């Protein structure tokens, strides 16, 4: 186990260090000046115009609210630590000047920068940090995501300790690199609930502050005297003087806005439009650019069809397998996606955490205690889903599906699949967006060949949230990619505790003691190899129970952007970060911007 002290790093006399890693040596020493993937001399200036998918309706906390916080809000706050984007699990102090982990790994203490202050000039102290944790832990989301915290203790004005229920894990560090954002106690103490819906932009401390907004846009301005601007973790980042998000709820309208130059940047989710919608004169002149970015931070299925196993209809593993066999991925890939998509055959597809082939010796050792509790095929067969020729000829898979349904007690009668009581096999796909219908409709046609009747119900966002929280659905399409390493998200996607809590990702209702044990094993692993083995075994156990139908593997981010920006030479190193964070590495190039503006004005 390697904790913080690495080649070139030095601990201070009191044991505090500049960074921490539980899985590998830190790349950057205590005297590092900036991350390798930035341009430390990037000029400041200009405006970046991005897009948002929802109206500006809320500026407060995102904990336990059904309304999305305004796009870009996270840049107005500071975090205790941040994750280096060119390391798997390297974390460095941001608001925290120093980090100390106790010998038993159950107390994590932070020393705050004495110079840190909020945008109103008030210093950031331990009281603000404790207040932020207390507020988060009082919410439903916080109780779930932060349940590993035993207590938060103020030592003095600049020192605060987080006492843990168990040993510190990489999952804990990864979460701390995102949450909680540090809130000002002096601002909130007389304002009440930090989670209340509000259109009053709150006080922050980050590199940007709220400037102005309306229902259809929000604009942020760079804080000239941002206290953390010269920190090594921030040099070369946050270069735009202003960042503006325009709200576009319809993808067709968004694409048109990009082509007209109303937006600087768009992540194209549809491979068909990527191929055919941007062959414009501006693209041919090199002004409107297309680029695929391959990220290592996400893996697994980008999407999966989820069946609610809490419902009797989907509680039988044979039924779930039959439903998986009826899905013809290859036909959809050919017909809709130009054959560009790769099917996910693992919950961690595209990473070293994915199971492949038959289990090896280390996996077998971990599996052995559960031999009588998992499907026998976990030991004897590599997991595969049937592949077709892409032209709708999946007769063999449907025949196998029919056999499984028969053994599960279903039979065909007058073209309908019925149980012993004569009840038809009928269920509903709940969809929040019309564009998902083209995934579901061909699948419904395949199910009809088995005598199964499936329908679609489109719902608006508020109703969708309510139905998700109350588990009132049969099936739907869920985003299912996981960060790397995936251990932070495992409890929320797969643990039985999450199956009964409304604000989690365990929408399939997975409740399996073997799965729980494997998740806990992965989280307590003390080496990267132990995490890999635990995840591979977990992968096999989950796959062979058919809770989901994995769809396409996580794909490269397909960027459409105007050639107005400078970019770091080593930007490609930053593969362990959310795709939208690349914007924080770019800068406005005056000459390039003038060229684009001139071309747009001519049009």
Predicted regions and their residues:
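Surface-exposed binding/hinge segments that line
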Residues: 111, 144-190, 205-214, 357-373
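Gly/Pro-rich hinge or "lid" segments in bacterial periplasmic/extracellular proteins
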Residues: 77-89, 177-242, 249-253, 260, ...
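Detector for C-terminal structural segments
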Residues: 14, 52-54, 67-71, 214-218, ...
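Extracellular/periplasmic solute-recognition and catalytic clefts
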Residues: 151-154, 211-221, 246-311, 318-322, ...
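A short beta-strand/turn structural motif
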Residues: 130-131, 148-149, 169-212, 231-240, ...
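A structural "hinge/loop" feature
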Residues: 16, 34, 54-72, 92-97, ...
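Aromatic- and charge-enriched surface segment that lines or borders ligand/interaction sites
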Residues: 28, 38, 42-43, 65-72, ...
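N-terminal lobe/hinge region of extracytoplasmic solute-binding protein
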Residues: 11-104, 111, 134, 203
């Amino acid at each position: 186990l390697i904790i913080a002290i690495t080649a070139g790093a030095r601990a201070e006399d009191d044991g505090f260090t500049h960074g921490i890693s539980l899985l590998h040596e830190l790349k950057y020493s205590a005297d590092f000046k900036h991350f390798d993937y930035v341009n430390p001399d990037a000029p400041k200036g200009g405006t970046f115009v991005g897009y948002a998918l929802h109206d500006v309706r809320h500026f407060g906390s995102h904990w336990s609210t059904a309304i999305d916080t305004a796009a870009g809000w996270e840049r107005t706050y500071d975090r205790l630590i941040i994750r280096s984007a060119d390391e798997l699990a390297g974390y460095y102090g941001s608001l925290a000047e120093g980090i100390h982990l106790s010998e038993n790994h159950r107390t994590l203490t932070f020393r705050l920068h004495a110079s840190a202050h909020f945008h109103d000039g008030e210093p950031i102290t331990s009281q603000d940090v404790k207040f932020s944790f207390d507020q988060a832990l009082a919410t439903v989301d916080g109780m779930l995501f932060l349940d590993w915290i035993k207590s938060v203790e103020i030592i003095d004005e600049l020192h605060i300790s987080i006492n843990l229920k168990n040993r510190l894990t990489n999952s804990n560090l990864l979460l701390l690199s995102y949450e909680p954002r540090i809130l000002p106690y002096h601002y909130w103490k007389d304002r009440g609930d930090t989670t209340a819906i509000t259109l009053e932009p709150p006080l922050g401390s980050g590199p940007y502050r709220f400037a102005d907004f309306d229902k259809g846009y929000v604009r942020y301005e760079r804080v000239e005297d941002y206290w953390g601007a010269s920190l090594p973790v921030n040099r070369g980042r946050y270069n735009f003087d202003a960042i503006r998000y325009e709200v576009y709820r319809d993808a067709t309208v968004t694409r048109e806005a990009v082509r007209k130059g109303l937006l600087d940047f768009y992540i194209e989710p549809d491979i068909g439009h990527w191929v055919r919608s941007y062959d414009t004169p501006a693209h041919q002149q090199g002004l409107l650019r297309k680029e695929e970015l391959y990220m290592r931070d996400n893996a697994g299925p980008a999407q999966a069809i989820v069946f609610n196993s809490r419902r009797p209809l989907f509680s039988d593993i044979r039924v779930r397998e039959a439903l998986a066999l009826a899905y013809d991925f290859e036909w959809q890939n050919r017909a809709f996606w130009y054959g560009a998509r790769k099917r996910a055959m693992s919950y961690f597809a595209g990473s070293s955490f994915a199971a492949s082939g038959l289990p090896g010796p280390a996996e077998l050792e971990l599996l052995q205690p559960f031999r009588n509790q998992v499907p026998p095929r976990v030991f004897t067969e590599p997991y595969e889903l049937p592949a077709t020729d892409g032209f709708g000829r999946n007769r063999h898979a449907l025949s196998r599906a029919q056999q499984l349904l028969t053994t599960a007690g279903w039979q065909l009668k007058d073209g309908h699949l019925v149980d012993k009581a004569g009840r038809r096999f009928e269920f509903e796909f709940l969809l929040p967006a019309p564009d998902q219908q083209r995934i579901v409709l061909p699948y419904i046609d395949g199910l009809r060949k088995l005598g199964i009747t499936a329908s679609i119900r489109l719902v608006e966002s508020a109703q969708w949230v309510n139905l998700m929280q109350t588990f009132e659905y049969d099936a739907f399409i869920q985003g299912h990619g996981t960060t790397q390493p995936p251990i932070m998200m495992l409890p929320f996607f797969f643990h039985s505790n999450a199956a009964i809590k409304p604000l989690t990702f365990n929408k399939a209702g997975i409740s399996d003691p073997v799965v729980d044990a494997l998740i806990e094993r992965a989280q307590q692993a003390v080496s990267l190899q132990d995490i890999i083995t635990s995840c591979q075994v977990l992968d096999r156990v989950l796959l062979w129970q058919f809770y989901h139908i994995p769809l396409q593997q996580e794909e490269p981010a397909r960027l459409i952007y105007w050639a107005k920006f400078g970019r770091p030479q080593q930007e490609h190193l930053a593969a362990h970060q959310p795709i939208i964070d690349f914007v924080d590495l770019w800068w406005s190039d005056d000459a390039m911007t003038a060229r684009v503006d001139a071309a747009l004005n001519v049009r």
